[in-house]
């Protein structure tokens, strides 16, 4: 079984100059999900929205081509792809010749799908969209919509996940609201390098205490876990402690190595958010 410790994270790595799909390093989701009480099917839907800003290859005449890639990985895949391995994989395209962008897109879709669905009884595919340079100026920047929790003047003293900070008002009428924060920070599971993010929480149900929610989000500050795992932990803590009727958690993390990862989890099927970067991304 692949584990994060066996990946290229935190290690000196050689950069392949020719296409090599074997560089992709899938890591099972199940182990970390078991830590937060998920055994078997997860109680949410969603996806991990990746943006690759450093994608380049050669055309058949050897001229470099560039594109931005939007990649959608369903959360029901049995694996995630470790991000440094994904960067190394993308770099292996740099000196490889392809007929056109559609050939690159098809190769990305096939390779990533194989990695994240590996061993699944009914494998499916990931979504891959390439943005050509002439469309770069149509890539928007927009902050997450919602009421900012960061306006609250709270005292913060806990910097490891503290779900006991989450409370809700169960004896009053349910509410529907969307709350945001730019204060999410966690650390890479293996290297301890800081990961900076913004988070949006939309729910219907007993009203969640906003001060406690902000303190809870801040409590991830010294926590070592991958982006996808942090968002699922937030979802499960809110789901079990605040008992919403509906819940959506969506985080957008700043890029590293030319990649950003933006996990989205929802209790009910709904339209996937557009992969639109924030100013910090």
Swiss-Prot record:
How is this protein annotated for GO cellular component? Answer: cytoplasm
Which PANTHER family is this protein grouped with?
NADPH-DEPENDENT 7-CYANO-7-DEAZAGUANINE REDUCTASE (PTHR34354:SF1)
Q: Which organism is it from?
A: Acidovorax ebreus (strain TPSY) (Diaphorobacter sp. (strain TPSY))
- Kindly tell me the pathway this chain contributes to: tRNA modification; tRNA-queuosine biosynthesis
What compartments host this protein? Cytoplasm
Residues that bind NADPH, according to the entry? Answer: 83-84, 256-257
Q: Does the keyword Disulfide bond apply?
A: no
Recorded GO terms, molecular function?
Answer: preQ1 synthase activity
Query: What's the stated role of this polypeptide?
Result: Catalyzes the NADPH-dependent reduction of 7-cyano-7-deazaguanine (preQ0) to 7-aminomethyl-7-deazaguanine (preQ1).
- One Pfam family, please name it: QueF
Subunit (UniProt): Homodimer.
Task: Spell out the NCBIfam families in the cross-references.
Answer: QueF
Active site at: 188, 195
Question: What keywords are annotated for this sequence in UniProt?
Answer: Cytoplasm, NADP, Oxidoreductase, Queuosine biosynthesis
Q: Which family does it belong to?
A: Belongs to the GTP cyclohydrolase I family. QueF type 2 subfamily.
Q: Does the keyword Oxidoreductase apply?
A: yes
Catalyses which reaction(s) = 7-aminomethyl-7-carbaguanine + 2 NADP(+) = 7-cyano-7-deazaguanine + 2 NADPH + 3 H(+)
Tell me the protein's name.
NADPH-dependent 7-cyano-7-deazaguanine reductase
InterPro entries from the xrefs?
Answer: GTP-CH-I_C/QueF, NADPH_dep_7-cyano-7-deazaG_red, QueF, QueF_N, QueF_type2
Name the positions where substrate binds. Answer: 81-83, 227-228
Principal localization?
Answer: cytoplasm
Q: Name one GO biological process term.
A: tRNA modification
* Top enzyme class: oxidoreductase
Q: Which domain of life is it from?
A: Bacteria
Q: EC?
A: 1.7.1.13
